[in-house]
């Protein structure tokens, strides 16, 4: 984990654009589960993170619509990055609660996720993530509660 955080260090806490955003995308794309889902980051700042993923058959459940776990994972990924980005390297942002509502079915196309802060405090943050489909209609909405932990927090005590 420390290696990944060191890679992010030059970028954290700032709005990224151009070449910096491309460099950060390369780092983010290398992250295991995010890479498996195909999450691509389009905008990263301390007040908003936007990402997308293209729907493909392996992300769908047997009825042919996007699996609920994809939405939940997208909420977790985008909001976690947003929370950590806002901390600006002052600690770790660790998800503690994820509540995602599935509103409309999606069978194909692109999902766009936008994370914005509802609350940012000393010990916790809450981020709302709206996920829209290609026609602009909301497909899902999630809320991630994040614990702000000091750097070097042990896994268990």
Show which residues each predicted segment covers.
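Terminal targeting signals and extreme-terminal segments of soluble enzymes
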Residues: 1-157
